[in-house]
Amino acid sequence: MATILGLLISYPLAYFIGVKARRWPILQGLMLTLVIAPFFISFLLRTFAWKQMFANESLIVTTLQSWGVLAPDQYLVGTDFMVIFGLTYNFIPFMTLPLYTSLERLDIRLLEAGSDLYANPAKVFGRVTLPLSMPGIISGTLMTFIPIAGDYVNASSQFLGSSETAMIGNVVEANFLRINDYPSASALSVLLMAAILALVTFYVRRSGTEDLL
């Protein structure tokens, strides 16, 4: 889910930076800097900051409760929403940068040719822009999905999740560090790695970009 959300958010952003903002190099550079800026802050610090911002007694939560968006006994931290939000935010640069690289290389004359042939914007996007940006989509999806599948920080009860939002990474971490059940943890790790490899192989072959492997 976080990977899909990241793609839906990153594609328009990367398209604007890589295609529309070409005429304004300063704006293009500024937006790229903003995309890269989170890398200069620790992953743990970023996640912990979101936990503090959406804590049970935070201004955001109390305001949403007063507006009736949240029930008086309803909170955000420890929910699936916050886990997905954290994953999407933390890994969205890994989706945006490959997309930007593909779209920045896009020849604008191809888009203009499509318009000259009376294709509407939707057809130009579906038949020109989307196919040419497919390598960026594949690369961004893989760079996002693989770390998300094994992530155990965002869903941890110490950060944005709870015991009810545990991901497989949290189960592996608990078996290794708390229960000391090393055989089960090792087996789960191997199963996770095999599942990711199988899904990635299937995804790349179905998309017709085997040369990326």
Regions found by a protein language model. Give the residues of each.
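Membrane-helix interface segments
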Residues: 20-30, 60, 79, 121, ...
